[in-house]
C-alpha cells in the first residue's frame, strides 16, 4: 500500500500540489485523471521519489520513502516517465535488460534473462528485439520502455501516460497487459491517463485532480458520471453504458 499524506509542491511560487492525500491499495490499477496542469504527473513523480516534495509524507508498505535505500526501493517500485531520452544507441533487448540493473548491477544472470525474455514476450517484441531504438516507430519505442519496466519486476509500477504514441490497437493491448499483471502477478499499478474511457474500462479505482488538489476519487461506476466529470473538466460529458462499461461521449 502507498499512502500519500498532505503532500504539497510549489514551482517558483506556483502551487502545483496542495495538501494532497490519497491511499493506493495493493493489487489494483489506480488511474489519475484530470485536465492538463492538474498535478497528476507531479504527484506520480513525488510518489516515486523522482521529485522532492515541499511538505507531507509518503509511505510505501509502512515505510517513509525518504528513509528507503535507493537500491532496495528500485526492487519494489518502478516508474516510466512521460518523456524518455537515452543518448546512447541501444537495441530493444539492451534497453529491456536495463530493467534488471537493481538486481544484477550490469552482470546479467540466467534469472535476469528469464525476466528480460518474459518482458519481451509480454510486449510482443521478440521479433524486433535486435532493432535499435532509433529504428522504431513511436509506438514500438513506447512498448520497449514498458517492457523494461516489466523486466524490473517490482511490486509497484507507476506509468505516466504510457499510451502516448500508441494507436488504438496497441493502447488496448497495453491496458489488457496491465490488467493481467495485476490479476495474474499481483502487481499494483498507478497510471496517469488522459482518456477517461480507458480509465473507466480498465481501472479498479480513479483519482481525479484539478488545480493541484484531489477533487474526487472512487471506483469507475462512481467517477464516470456526468456531474462528476463536469466538476473535473468544466464540460458536460454524456455517459452511455456499452457492454456494462460506462463510456463518456466527450467528442459530441
UniProtKB/Swiss-Prot annotation:
InterPro entries registered for this protein in UniProt: AAA+_ATPase, ABC_transporter-like_ATP-bd, ABC_transporter-like_CS, P-loop_NTPase, Siderophore_ABC-ATPase
Localisation per UniProt entry: Cell membrane
Cited PROSITE patterns: ABC_TRANSPORTER_1, ABC_TRANSPORTER_2
SUPFAM superfamilies (UniProt xref): P-loop containing nucleoside triphosphate hydrolases
Molecular function GO terms recorded: ATP binding; ATP hydrolysis activity
CDD domains: ABC_Iron-Siderophores_B12_Hemin
Traits of the deletion mutant: Disruption mutants are unable to use petrobactin for iron delivery and growth.
Protein topology in the membrane: Peripheral membrane protein
Enzyme Commission number: 7.2.2.-
One GO CC term on file: plasma membrane
Reaction catalysed by this enzyme: a Fe(III)-siderophore(out) + ATP + H2O = a Fe(III)-siderophore(in) + ADP + phosphate + H(+)
Coiled coil location: none
Keyword Transferase in record: no
Annotated keywords: ATP-binding, Cell membrane, Ion transport, Iron, Iron transport, Membrane, Nucleotide-binding, Translocase, Transport
Superkingdom field: Bacteria
Top-rank EC class of the record's enzyme: translocase
Protein's GO biological process: iron ion transport
Span of domain ABC transporter: 2-236
Residues that bind ATP: 34-41
Assembly and binders: The complex is composed of two ATP-binding proteins (YclP), two transmembrane proteins (YclN and YclO) and a solute-binding protein (YclQ).
PANTHER family: IRON(3+)-HYDROXAMATE IMPORT ATP-BINDING PROTEIN FHUC, PETROBACTIN IMPORT ATP-BINDING PROTEIN YCLP
Family: Belongs to the ABC transporter superfamily.
Function comment: Part of the ABC transporter complex YclNOPQ involved in uptake of ferric-petrobactin. Petrobactin is a photoreactive 3,4-catecholate siderophore produced by many members of the B.cereus group, including B.anthracis. Probably responsible for energy coupling to the transport system.
Protein name per UniProt: Petrobactin import ATP-binding protein YclP
